[in-house]
From Swiss-Prot:
A molecular-function term among this protein's GO annotations: acetyl-CoA C-acyltransferase activity
Keyword annotations of the record: Acyltransferase, Cytoplasm, Fatty acid metabolism, Lipid degradation, Lipid metabolism, Transferase
GO cellular component: cytoplasm
Protein's UniProt keywords contain Ribosomal protein: no
Record-given protein name: 3-ketoacyl-CoA thiolase
Quaternary structure annotation from Swiss-Prot or TrEMBL: Heterotetramer of two alpha chains (FadB) and two beta chains (FadA).
Pathway the protein contributes to: Lipid metabolism; fatty acid beta-oxidation
Similarity comment: Belongs to the thiolase-like superfamily. Thiolase family.
Compartments where found: Cytoplasm
Catalytic activity field: an acyl-CoA + acetyl-CoA = a 3-oxoacyl-CoA + CoA
Length: 390
């Protein structure tokens, strides 16, 4: 177990909503800010501390318009009933937004600019489309190809560069669903999912506490029958080996080690290191490799020291390419043990804190000590966080 210093950044708790389908899904009548506020209230209820001590609520969100606009972070805090003296901000690093929220809060704690932070992220992709209101500068084409904005084509590029076959991708996708459904049936998500009121297909109110995107019947034959969607003539990436459009939120409670101790709260993990890195936009999915390498170096670790990994699965071709790049291709038995975004979906701003929360729970379930959460980011970035149980 890790020995803590007073200003070490500890994770006290982490929760998430179930993941809903973006098209006519269970959260179709639930707003992004309301969904997030439910998690903040649950996080507070699960942990005894004075909410007046919260320095800031930091929320990741990508498409900050419509119901996700006007600093959704501040709105979430007010909706959740936090004192008006608690500040709120919204951060955007595209797919890595809520992991960036972790990093932002951690940096403030480490430099003595606050002791308690609530962080999280949300994306309601059913209400706010991925490209809603986007107006990219035509001059940007000098620096990256327009096709680099099409995430599926970047996955095709990575797959070809790293020799990832269609069969490998299909197998990876089916396994993601199998693991996620097994985790659901065995109750491995119960400690992280907070049930939120939504609606079933008939419009009746239900408590949504099971991920809606998982396909229990996923099988190799069905996956093999699908045609490539991004490069119809020579491609290998299909809808089944891409992360689903989904709606969801996540939240975490971070503190300084000394404040958690003073409050009698037992930390679940300490943040060992953090990193971000850039790469070519055409292979944006490779970003976790340089980001992880930086984070490992800062922690004085090697990839061999990592016992549990949560890697965002934007696409099977992307995930497998990253595993090859990190030397984890033959260690998939320690990666995404409860399934990944191919099965659970990838609500952009939600995903960073979601995979970190899932990582924490898997580490406890597997009784491992050191874990890595990492993800790719559109336009060529990666982000990584190394945590250790305490």
């Amino acid at each position: 177990m890790a020995t803590l210093n007073p200003r070490d950044v500890v994770i006290v708790d982490g929760v998430r909503s179930a993941m809903g389908k973006s098209k006519n899904g269970m959260f179709r009548n639930v707003r992004a800010d309301s969904l997030s506020a439910e998690l903040v209230r649950a996080l507070i209820a699960r942990n005894q501390f004075d909410v007046n001590e919260v320095e800031d609520l930091i929320w990741g969100c990508v498409n900050q318009t419509l119901e996700q606009g006007m600093n959704i972070g501040r709105n979430i805090g007010l909706l959740a009933g936090l004192p008006k003296t608690v500040a709120g901000q919204t951060v955007n690093r595209l797919c890595g937004s809520s992991m960036q929220a972790i990093h932002t809060a951690a940096a403030q704690i480490a430099t003595n600019q606050g002791d308690i932070f609530i962080i999280g992220g949300v994306e309601h992709m059913g209400h706010v489309g991925m490209m809603h209101g986007i107006d990219l500068n035509p001059e940007a084409s000098k620096h990256y190809a327009k096709a680099s904005n099409m995430m599926g084509l970047t996955a095709e590029m990575l797959g070809r560069m790293n020799g990832i076959t269609r069969e490998e991708q299909d197998t990876f996708g089916v396994e993601s669903h199998r693991r996620a459904w097994a985790a659901t049936q065995e109750g491995r998500f119960k400690n992280e999912i907070i049930g939120v009121e939504g609606h079933d297909a008939n419009g009746f109110k239900i408590l949504c506490d099971i991920d809606e995107v998982i396909r229990p019947d996923a099988n190799l034959e069905a996956f093999k029958a699908l045609k490539p969607v991004f490069d119809p003539k020579g491609g290998s990436v299909t809808a089944a080996t891409s992360s689903a459009l989904s709606d969801g939120a996540s939240a975490m409670l971070l503190m300084s080690a000394e404040r958690a101790q003073a409050l009698g709260l037992k930390p679940r993990a300490v943040i060992r290191s953090m990193a971000v890195a850039g790469c070519d936009a055409a292979i944006m999915g490779y970003g976790p490799v340089p980001a992880t390498q930086k984070a490992l170096k800062r922690a004085g670790l090697s990839i061999a020291d990592i016992q549990t990994v949560e890697l965002n699965e934007a696409f099977a071709a992307q995930g497998l390419s990253v595993l090859k790049g990190l030397g984890l291709y033959d260690k998939q038995d320690i990666v995404n043990l409860n399934g990944g975004a191919i099965a659970l979906g990838h609500p952009l701003g939600c995903s960073g804190a979601r995979i970190t929360t899932t990582l924490l729970n898997v580490m406890e379930q597997q009784d491992t000590q050191i874990g890595l959460a990492t993800m790719c980011i559109g336009l060529g970035q990666g982000i990584a966080t190394v945590i250790e149980r305490v």
